[in-house]
């Protein structure tokens, strides 16, 4: 959380997502959210942090074998290792659950690294 002051993070925790989206919209940022994302569990604290983004595209089964995941430069692996402490990993899977945006091993790795949370639509 080097870029955003802790005081700013605390202030944002008190503001609704709808209010923030409206403010961004008024500033000309019209595509600043992923649609239909819901919390896994209601009643948990608001997740606030800088966004570290990753976008998946549909994979070709004939080209995207398990071997690609062994590559240390695979974008999913890079994102898990580079997402900064305190940040939120935001994954755009284009609403395709087959994209397998993150499993328990990757989520655990992010937790150990101090990432504040994950938002995904896939």
Please state what every model-predicted region is.
Residues 78-120:
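Extracellular/luminal Protease-associated
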């Amino acid at each position: 959380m080097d870029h955003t002051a802790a005081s700013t993070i605390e202030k944002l925790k008190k503001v609704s997502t709808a209010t923030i989206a409206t403010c961004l919209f008024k500033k000309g940022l019209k595509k600043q959210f992923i649609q239909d994302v819901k919390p896994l569990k209601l009643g948990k604290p608001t997740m606030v942090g800088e966004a570290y983004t990753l976008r998946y595209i549909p994979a070709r089964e004939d080209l995207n074998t398990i071997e690609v995941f062994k590559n240390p430069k695979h974008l999913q692996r890079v994102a898990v290792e580079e997402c900064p402490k305190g940040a939120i990993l935001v994954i755009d899977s284009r609403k395709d659950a087959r994209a397998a945006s993150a499993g328990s091993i990757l989520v655990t790795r992010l937790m150990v690294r101090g990432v504040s949370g994950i938002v995904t639509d896939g």
